[in-house]
C-alpha cells in the first residue's frame, strides 16, 4: 500500500515536469521519497525483501482456510477476577484496535489497573501493527498514553515471560507463533512473544485468520482466554467489570 501511494505521487511529480508546475514537482518528490522509505522500513520489519512482497505469495495459497478448531469465549467478569492482583500487564494493540477506535477505552483500562491494583502497564508495539509503522503509536498518543509505556517489539519480548497477563487487542499475525517456524507464509517474520506470558487475553471478533491466512495457535492455548466481540464494546465491558469488582 505504501509503495502504491508513493508511486501515485511520483506520477504527480512527473506531471509537474510536463506542465512546468514546481509545486507538484517538489510535493510529489518529497511524498514519493517518504513512501519509498516507509516501504523499505515495513519490508525489514516483516523480514521480507521488496521482490518477495511484490511477486511472491504472502497470504497463503489463495484458498480460504477452514478452521476446524473451536474455542469457548470468556466473559469480562472472569477476566476482571484474573486481573485482581496482577503485578504486570502488557497490552498488545493491533489493527483491530484501530478499526474499533477503542484506544481511549484501553487507556481507561490501564488507568484502572494502575490506580486500583498498582499494576505496571506497558504496551508492546510491533513495527508493522496496523497499516503503517507508527500507527499504534499515533492512536495511543491520541489517548494520552505516556510515551515511556510504549515499548518496541525487540525491547518488550524479553519481558513477556514476566507478565502476569498479556492483553491482545485485534492483533493476529504480529503475535502468531508460526513466525518462529521455517515454513509457511509467516516463516521468519519477527513476532511479539505473547505466548510466553503467564495468562493471555485476546479481544477479537472471531477466530478468523489474519492477512497471512494462517491459523493462530496462540488462540487455542490453555492459558488463553478469548473475548469475542467489538473491541470498543469488550474493553468498555471489561472496564465496568473492574470497577464493580
Regions found by a protein language model. Give the residues of each.
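Membrane-embedded alpha-helical segments of transport systems
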Residues: 3-11, 34-38, 167
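Aromatic/pi-system hotspot detector in well-structured domains
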Residues: 1-8, 42, 140, 155
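Membrane-interfacial segments at transmembrane helix termini in multi-pass membrane proteins
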Residues: 26-86
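Structured cytosolic domains appended to multi-pass membrane proteins
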Residues: 67-245
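Structural signature of transmembrane alpha-helix termini at the membrane-water interface
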Residues: 14-17, 37-40, 242
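Gly/Ser/Thr-rich helix-start
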Residues: 17, 21, 29, 33-36, ...
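Transmembrane helix-loop junctions at the membrane interface of multipass transporters and ion channels
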Residues: 2-27
Amino acid at each position: 500500500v505504501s509503495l502504491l501511494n508513493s508511486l501515485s505521487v511520483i506520477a504527480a511529480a512527473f506531471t509537474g515536469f510536463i506542465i512546468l508546475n514546481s509545486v507538484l514537482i517538489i510535493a510529489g518528490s518529497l511524498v514519493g521519497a517518504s513512501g519509498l522509505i516507509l516501504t523499505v522500513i515495513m519490508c525489514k520489519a516483516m523480514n521480507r525483501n521488496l521482490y518477495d512482497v511484490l511477486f511472491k505469495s504472502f497470504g497463503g495459497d489463495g484458498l480460504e482456510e477452514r478452521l476446524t478448531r473451536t474455542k469457548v469465549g470468556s466473559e469480562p467478569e472472569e477476566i476482571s477476577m484474573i486481573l485482581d492482583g496482577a503485578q504486570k500487564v502488557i497490552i498488545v494493540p493491533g489493527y483491530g484496535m484501530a478499526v474499533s477506535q477503542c484506544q481511549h477505552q484501553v487507556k481507561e483500562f490501564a488507568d484502572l489497573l494502575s490506580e486500583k491494583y498498582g499494576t505496571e502497564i506497558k504496551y508492546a508495539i510491533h513495527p508493522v501493527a496496523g497499516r503503517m509503522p507508527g500507527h499504534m503509536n499515533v492512536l495511543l498518543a491520541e489517548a494520552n498514553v505516556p510515551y515511556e509505556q510504549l515499548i518496541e517489539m525487540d525491547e518488550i519480548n524479553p519481558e513477556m515471560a514476566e507478565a502476569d497477563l498479556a492483553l491482545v487487542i485485534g492483533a493476529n499475525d504480529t503475535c502468531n507463533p508460526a513466525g518462529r517456524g521455517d515454513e509457511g507464509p509467516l516463516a521468519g517474520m519477527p513476532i511479539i512473544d505473547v505466548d510466553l506470558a503467564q495468562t493471555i487475553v485476546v479481544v477479537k471478533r472471531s477466530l478468523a485468520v489474519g492477512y497471512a491466512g494462517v491459523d493462530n495457535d496462540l488462540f487455542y492455548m490453555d492459558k488463553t482466554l478469548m473475548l469475542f466481540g467489538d473491541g470498543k464494546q469488550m474493553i468498555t465491558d471489561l472496564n465496568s467489570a473492574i470497577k464493580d469488582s
